Each structure stands twice: as structure tokens, then as C-alpha cells.
Amino acid sequence: MDKYQKICNEVRKTYPSLELDNIIKDIRKAVGLIGIDTRESDMKYLPPIFGFIRGCVFIEKGNPVIFINATLEPNAKRYVIAELLGYILLYLPADNIDPNHAYYLKLDESKEENIKINETLYYFAAELLAPTEEVYSDFLSYGKLDYNAIDTIAAKYKVPKRIITNSIKKYLDQKSGGENHDV
């Protein structure tokens, strides 16, 4: 079990509404039950300097609010919610939140610290939405390498296919001691 699996297990223990079945059924409701509102926006109010924004976190009356770009596909919206939830739980300064500040997931990729944050948020979101162990178990149930299985599993967890292929690869890498596997 890697650190992201441990983090997500701890998050699920701390916030029972974030159990996998609840996340699959309605991630917005599950996140709302821990006091985090989610809303959609076309993001047109942001200056063009920001480029394309998939989502951001605003603070409203002391509570974080996740805004998702309304132009995204439904599964991409779910992923952005999970990623921003990770940002809130893992990085947002709980005791020093600036109520006049928006927190964006647009980090300067030239800084190593930001690369690590992006990586952490990707793996957190992937693990929260489609736990590695369960994805691999679902994949094994097909009995052979079947790329249609990837589509079916992605539909089950309501995530982009790359999340499923990366989870399977991650599982194989963990079990083989770190050897790289292609899926």
C-alpha cells in the first residue's frame, strides 16, 4: 500500500461520507456532507492571463467552495472535484485562510515543489475516485487482457480511462518491486 492509498483510507475513516460508494454515486453530495460546497462556473469572469482553469477554491464565510469549469465533461468534473478536495485537505492552510483569496490549481511547473503538489493531487484524486486495489481486482475479473475492460471499469468508477490504466500499472509496479509495466 502506498502513501496515497493510506491517505485516502484515512480520509474515508475521518469523513465517512467520502466512502467509495458515496463518491461513485454523487461526489458533490459526499463532499457537501463534510461542509464543502461545489459549484459550476464558465470561468469567464477570470482574466485571460489565467488561461484555461479546470477548477478553483474560493473561501466563502470561512468555508472552502469548489468551483468547477462547467465546460468539462462529467467525469472530468468529478476528477477536478476530487483533486481540489485533496488540495483543501492536504494543502489549504486551515488556520490562516485568506477570505479574499482564490486558490487555483495552476502551479508553476518549473518549480519542483509544485511538480510534487500536482503529482500528489493527481494520485490523491485517482485513489479517492478509483482505489488501486479495487480497480485491479475488477481488471482481474475479466480473466485476460481486455481493453474493453478498461472502458467498463472507467464507467463503473466514473473516471477518465487514464486513471484506470495508471491504477493497473501502479498496482503491477507495486507488486513487482517497482518494475515498470505498460498497460
Each model region followed by its residue ranges:
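Active-site hotspot residues in diverse enzymes, especially metal/ion-binding acidic/histidine motifs
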Residues: 1-183
